[in-house]
């Protein structure tokens, strides 16, 4: 994510309570490095130079339910990440779900990033469509599916109703 040539670790903690927000969820990025790691890493020690925390937004969103590398979605040469929050309520649609793409960059990460701060320059939010779709239940990099030179993502919505058929699931 930070372009240092070492793979990073992405961890989801869907039941975390960031800022006292019950089950908003958190995710953690631990930066890879030369020379290895100690036998355990205290995630509360992430300070921006060794990794960072991504805070979920609202109560019961369970952000971090699913996490994945996203490839390089914006084509800037840095790997991006993908975080699912399958029970988020975008636009008042109960449990339609949300997913977040967070852009990688060369250094300068703060120790905590609130997913509500994604503004297009640092990442973006993908809102589920309909009530109870559970969009973001599964997330994954897809590679460059359409051949435009940018990596694409797959977002699973396990209870979506494609073509009006209940609970058939859909991946937009």
Write out the residue ranges for each language-model feature:
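Conserved beta-strand/short-helix segments
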Residues: 1-172
